[in-house]
Amino acid sequence: MMVSRRELFGLAAGAALQAPRLAGQEGQRPVFRVKVDMVVLAFTVTDSKNHYINGLKPPDFRIYEDGILQKLNTFAEGTKPPLLIADDGTARPLVDAQGSGTAPEGGPVGLDRPDAFIGTNVFVLFDTSNFMYRGFVYAEDAIADFVRGLDRADSVAVYTFSRNLSRAAVLTRDHNDAINGLRRSVAGDDTALYNALLLTLRDAAKVPGRKVVIVFSNGPDNASMVAPDDVRAVAEDEGITIYTISTNEVTKDTISNSALRRIAQRTGGKAYSARTWQKQVEAFESIREDLGNSYTITYYPAANPNEGFRKIAVEIVSDPGKKFRVHTRPGYRPSRSL
């Protein structure tokens, strides 16, 4: 059964959340497949001292999939306006000074909303379960400070979850509106972290441009019907970077913290352990720095017979000594089952 990527998330999320009803139907798990069109690749570049390398241009990069050189489609650094890369390698603004798109009418899918490629679409997923009860108010303050500090080009959504997901504030460039939604959140009971994360990824997948999900949680999950690695694979294939902030002690719940760390690393994000308000603020500051010092490249994959996992490699042509380090996802599956 072939379905679109958007249809997959609706079906997959529905199937995941209704799993208990299907307990007696062994061997009847539906399989849905998705196909990747335009690839959005976000990454940071650092030196040996972990300092960000800024100012690199499109000719400085070569992107490979399974060793096959890819043609760049668009290029952006931080919150600067994205550039459209022509066949001859020249670049021009994707969006003009008035905010109008310069992509040709009838052009490639994904460029029909050029303004969506300005800034980052940030989804904050906030754990409001009983595991977070003691630090609830402090966590709210740390998230609110983070949202206030985002670049005005960034869009932000605030989702909360315990057993169920609540869209406290849908994606908006009005950061005050997002904070107001956050302040209306209430504490819940059990924790279905991976159910909530899958639903958040479904929403993020509908939005063009660069997407980031920040998971703020105590870590344990006692109510989800989907596995962490399944959710991680969806984010990896969609090109959605995930950052995780755990308020739990690493040594107290090694399984949960290990799962969160793996999700972050495999999607090009970072994992933080932050029990105190100060550590939480520092984690958010680190994430904000990552967003402001990142590069985002899009491309349409060249012909490749590999329908399994495709390895992505980013080469910096202007760094022949290989002194720089690229932080990004290791690859994706152009067509996968869930």
What is each of the regions a protein language model found here?
Residues 1-14:
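N-terminal secretory signal peptides and thylakoid transit peptides that target proteins
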Residues 23-338:
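Scaffold/interface architecture of coatomer-like assemblies
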